[in-house]
Regions:
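Residue-level signal for short segments within beta-strands and strand-turn junctions
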Residues: 39, 93, 111-112
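Class I (Rossmann-like) S-adenosyl-L-methionine-dependent methyltransferase catalytic domain
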Residues: 137-140
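A solvent-exposed, acidic/Ser-Thr-rich amphipathic alpha-helical stretch
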Residues: 3-10, 24-88, 100-101
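Short beta-strand edge/turn micro-motifs at domain boundaries
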Residues: 103-134
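Outer-membrane beta-barrel domain signature
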Residues: 95-97
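Short helix-adjacent coil turns
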Residues: 15, 22-23
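Short beta-strand segments enriched in hydrophobic/aromatic residues
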Residues: 31, 89-91, 124-127
């Protein structure tokens, strides 16, 4: 039986592979129903269905879009079925006809589901490096 750490790392790899394969259905399966994201540009989405639809839109509008999340560390509360993942992300996409790159750090909260799988509750991405032409978030 895999450890919780291995299960979370495997789920992250499935998420990366789903992005590579443009597979929004698999992404949805990895998310808690009340999933919440704050993107690297500070956009926010709530709910597994909304997030899967957002990915489907990205895949349809920009076939060059690719994002990879690389886990640095995972801290697990086995008794409560909670975990925090910290890592680095990198992405590239087409903007105004030009391929641009961005990268940064992320934090993810995982929760063990009733069936024993680990699903993402929330992810927060912070952009640290970016190519000229990347669009920053609007000020709050």
């Amino acid at each position: 039986m895999p450890t919780s750490n291995e299960m979370i790392r495997n789920a992250r790899e499935r998420f990366n592979k789903a992005i590579e394969d443009k597979d929004a259905a698999t992404i949805r399966m990895l998310l808690a129903p009340t999933y919440h994201i704050v993107t690297g540009r500070s956009d926010q989405n709530h709910g597994a269905g909304e997030e899967a639809a957002r990915w489907a839109g990205v895949f349809q509008s920009d076939p060059t879009a690719i994002y990879i999340r690389t886990t640095r560390e995972i801290t697990i509360n086995e008794a409560w079925g909670l975990a925090e993942e910290l890592g680095n992300w990198q992405g590239s996409y087409t903007l105004a006809g030009k391929l641009v790159n961005a990268s940064g750090v992320y934090s993810a909260k995982w929760q063990r589901a009733r069936n024993g799988d680990w699903v993402l509750q929330t992810e927060v991405f912070t952009t640290i490096e970016f190519d000229e032409g990347c669009v920053p978030p609007e000020p709050i």
